[in-house]
């Protein structure tokens, strides 16, 4: 029996450059990253090292200058905005550095809220929220 976990996110040779006036600024050069199901990954580095840019690319919010992005083995590198939006909605989640819970809501209600905004019915959202809270503690 094969116990190897499935790769859920893979970045291959990701490069990202920006223009500052007439200068080209290379922010990421040849980054490879593979994340398997159930893994927890931390990106650490000094300010300006490209962490946020890499996360924006991995989250399909930013397009790399070159390289490939695979989500559940599907090459997402050349997808249009509509399909990228659907993949973000269905498979990705973000917790931003400066996040705030809604103080008048319970933990369960705070977890339910993005699902309800996405159109998930309340029963399903509550069930999934409880599962997530139990899993994450």
Regions found by a protein language model. Give the residues of each.
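A short, flexible loop at the N-terminus of ABC-type nucleotide-binding domains that lies
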Residues: 4-8, 17-30
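ABC ATPase NBD coupling module
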Residues: 22, 76-93, 122
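Short beta-strand immediately N-terminal to the Walker A/P-loop
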Residues: 41-42, 94
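Conserved ABC ATPase "signature" region
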Residues: 74-75, 112, 123-137
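Helix-to-loop junction immediately C-terminal to a conserved catalytic motif
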Residues: 59
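Short coil-to-helix segment of the ABC ATPase nucleotide-binding domain corresponding to the Q-loop/switch region
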Residues: 105-114
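Conserved ABC transporter NBD signature motif
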Residues: 67-78
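The feature captures the beta-strand-to-loop junction immediately N-terminal to the Walker
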Residues: 44-46
């Amino acid at each position: 029996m094969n116990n190897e976990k499935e790769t859920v996110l893979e970045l291959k040779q990701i490069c990202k450059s920006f223009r500052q006036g007439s200068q080209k600024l290379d922010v990421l050069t040849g980054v490879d990253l593979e994340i398997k199901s159930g893994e927890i990954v931390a990106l650490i580095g000094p300010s300006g090292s490209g962490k946020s840019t890499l996360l924006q690319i991995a989250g399909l919010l930013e397009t790399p200058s070159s390289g490939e992005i695979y989500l559940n083995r599907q090459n997402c590198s050349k997808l249009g905005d509509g399909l990228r939006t659907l993949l973000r909605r269905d498979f990705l989640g973000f917790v931003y550095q400066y996040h705030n819970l809604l103080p008048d809501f319970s933990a369960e209600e705070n977890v339910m809220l993005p699902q309800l905004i996405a159109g998930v019915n309340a029963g399903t959202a509550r069930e999934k929220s409880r599962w997530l809270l139990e899993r994450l503690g």
